Design a protein with these regions (language model features):
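Solvent-exposed loop/turn segments at secondary-structure junctions
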Residues: 50-53, 90-95, 117-122, 139-142, ...
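Soluble non-cytosolic domains of exported or imported proteins
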Residues: 61-69, 94-98, 138-143, 195-206
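Active-site histidine-acidic residue metal-binding/catalytic motifs
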Residues: 27-103, 107-111, 121-124, 128-130, ...
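Flexible glycine-/small-residue-rich
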Residues: 7-9, 27-29, 48-50, 115-117, ...
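Sec-exported extracytoplasmic/periplasmic mature domains
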Residues: 72-83, 105-109, 140, 149-158, ...
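Active-site-adjacent mobile loop/cap segments within catalytic or ligand-binding domains
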Residues: 121, 133-135, 164-224
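Signal-peptide-cleaved, periplasmic/extracellular N-terminal interaction regions immediately downstream
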Residues: 1-43
Length: 224
């Protein structure tokens, strides 16, 4: 069965509920954007990727450690801009993938950004297949993915592996635009070494914040 629904304005997100044989759908409108600072007053969910599991670099750097460091820097940068930041984790304890999206939805977040570091399976050459990738799933998240991807390319100075639509658990939430960033390849020795440094972690974090700024600034202009 397929439903076609006509809307009076753009849909920012949606939520579908089926309860006692009753189907209902909530449609979310774009947030009101502050013209002087497009991030001020928003709620952003920051998801430092993993644990459990997670990739490990050549010298043993475990992905959840630098992703948390980057996530905490993103939190601090956003908080300084007047953003209400919701973290899916602030320590090394594992958090279920589906719970991460639930945390963002319960907080009524305006966006969800999941922070990761990439790796390749055995048999693939990382020297010819590495760089920065940004994933989204639902169409309403694509503009956020593209804005953040461009900002990450500027900050991290790595090859462009593109913006890709993929059905990943953490970016399936429909209530807000959700993206997953694979900023660098932890399996590359130089990138693993860079991700150990506060300076490069700061650059990763700044790329995310700059991407959010560009996205919400454009959204505010489009919906003004």
């Amino acid at each position: 069965m397929r439903y076609n629904i006509s809307l009076r304005g753009p849909a920012y997100g949606f939520q579908v509920v089926w309860h006692d044989s009753v189907f209902s759908m909530r449609v979310r409108r774009p947030p009101t954007i502050d013209a002087t600072d497009p991030l001020k007053g928003l709620t952003i969910a920051v998801d430092p990727g993993h644990p459990p599991i997670g990739a490990t670099g050549p010298t043993g750097l475990w992905e959840p450690i630098p992703t948390l460091a980057v996530g905490l820097k993103v939190r601090d940068m956003l908080a300084a801009r007047g953003v209400n930041v919701v973290m899916t984790r602030t320590d090394s304890l594992p958090v279920d993938l589906n719970l991460r999206g639930t945390i963002a939805r319960r907080a009524n977040a305006n966006a969800l950004v999941s922070i990761h570091l990439n790796a390749l399976p055995d048999g693939q050459n990382p020297y010819t297949n590495q760089g920065t990738t940004t994933f989204y799933f639902y169409p309403q998240a694509e503009p956020l993915a593209r804005a953040t991807h461009q900002a990450l390319l500027t900050q991290l100075s790595l090859p462009d592996k593109g913006v890709i639509r993929r059905n990943l658990a953490v970016i399936r939430p429909t209530w807000m635009p959700s993206i997953l960033c694979e900023g660098a390849f932890i399996m590359m020795p130089d990138q693993e070494a860079a991700m150990r440094t506060p300076e490069y972690q700061e650059r990763y974090a700044k790329g995310i914040v700059d991407g959010l700024d560009a996205y919400f600034r454009a959204l505010g202009q489009a919906t003004h």
